[in-house]
Amino acid sequence: MRCLPVFVILLLLIASAPSVDARPKTKDDMPLASFHDNAKRILQILQDRNACCIVRQCC
């Protein structure tokens, strides 16, 4: 029972500690938005190629 207050205090201290990024940011890190933009661009290119081949104008 004597350990319970210490345990509660430790939990409160851990919960209120500022969050820190586990690894430092490097020059190779890219924002997630750029990955989404790249994926959208690639999908658009593939859709354009598929539509073109269905019409058989550029195959």
From Swiss-Prot:
Name it.
Conotoxin mr5a
Q: Record's superkingdom?
A: Eukaryota
* Coiled-coil features, chain-numbered ranges: none
Chief localization class? Answer: secreted
**Record localization:** Secreted
> In the UniProt entry, what is the domain comment?
The cysteine framework is V (CC-CC).
GO MF, any single term: toxin activity
One GO CC annotation: extracellular region
**Leader peptide range in chain numbering:** 1-22
Keyword Calcium listed: no
Instruction: Tell me what organism the protein belongs to.
Output: Conus marmoreus
